[in-house]
Amino acid sequence: MDFKSVEGKVAIVTGASRGIGEAIARCYAANGMKVICAARSVEQGQAVVNDIINNGGDAIFVQTDCSDGNAIKDLVDKAVVHYGRLDGVVSNAGIGMG
């Protein structure tokens, strides 16, 4: 895959505090994307963002409950205000059962 095509693009990744969402956020940032990491856990989400930044990436954290439509609107608004645009969304948020 040619990751040069994503360089400079802006994406929201939900569920970015761990698991698949975290891996996607890290991969995007490592390949030059600007990433908005969204998750419910401030501590875990901010830790991911701090690590991305410490490794030369560009990311912000927005605490978000993806079951709340107003929170989703706020997430998109914050992304656009911070980066000036939004190129994509990875909808990865979920709830563990069991």
Residue ranges, per PLM feature:
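The beta1-alpha1 cofactor-binding region of Rossmann-like NAD(H)/NADP(H)-dependent oxidoreductases
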Residues: 42, 63-75
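Aromatic pocket-lining residues of Rossmann-like dinucleotide-binding sites
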Residues: 28
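Conserved glycine-rich Rossmann-like NAD(P)H-binding loop of the short-chain dehydrogenase/reductase
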Residues: 31-48
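Flexible N-terminal pre-Rossmann segment of NAD(P)-dependent oxidoreductases
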Residues: 1-12
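Hydrophobic/aromatic anchor residues within beta-strands of the central parallel beta-sheet
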Residues: 59-61
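Rossmann-fold scaffold of SDR-type NAD(P)-dependent oxidoreductases
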Residues: 14, 86-94
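Helix N-cap/beta-alpha junction loops of NAD(P)-dependent oxidoreductase domains
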Residues: 96-98
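Conserved glycine-rich cofactor-binding loop
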Residues: 10, 17-19, 41
